A protein has these predicted regions:
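HotDog/MaoC-like acyl-thioester-processing domains
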Residues: 1-22, 97-149
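Hot-dog-fold acyl-thioester-processing enzymes
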Residues: 2-86
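Residue-level signal for alpha-helical context at structural boundaries
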Residues: 52-56, 92, 144
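Mid-chain, well-packed structural core segment of small domains
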Residues: 80-102
Length: 149
């Protein structure tokens, strides 16, 4: 697992440029236990996420991870880099199923800088892929960052 957590106080609007990349976050392989725990935490006990026989029965080839878990991985990447209090908007599209043992890598790129109500805002694109490069999530985000002066 890569942990590129940066002190959020060190990420300033003035220092971020369009085209900059966010330090990637690589998660350990998704496990069955992790999905059962996530089901308990989220209240989503759909057997598609916890029962291998059910997944085979309905044709998904086994268990698939909760989409919101993978979205949470992307959110972790954003909060690790920018800090937990600056996120203003976060939208994703689910593009593919995540399976047991998939290694998810989250990446992001800055696409725009602008001001809203005297806040320096950064817009960017994010994605989550597995070890084969298959896209699981694409999305966008907006954060409000402090200025140096």
């Amino acid at each position: 697992m890569t942990n590129n957590t940066q002190d959020p106080a060190k990420v300033y609007y003035d220092d971020v440029q369009v085209g900059d990349t966010i330090p990637k976050l690589v998660k350990p392989p998704v496990s069955h236990l992790q999905l059962v725990r996530y089901a308990g935490a989220s209240g989503d006990f759909n057997p598609l996420h916890t029962d291998p026989k059910f997944g085979e029965l309905i044709g998904t080839g086994g268990i698939i991870a909760h989409g919101m878990l993978i979205m949470g991985f992307v959110g972790q990447m954003l909060s690790d880099y920018f800090g937990p209090t600056v996120l203003r908007k976060f939208d994703v599209r689910f593009k593919g199923m995540t399976r047991i043992d998939d290694v998810i890598t989250c990446t992001g790129t800055i696409t725009e800088k602008h001001e809203v109500d005297n806040e320096g805002r950064i817009t960017g694109k994010v994605r989550a892929t597995d070890q084969n490069g298959d896209v699981k999530i694409t999305g966008t985000f907006v954060v409000a960052l402090p200025r140096r002066s």
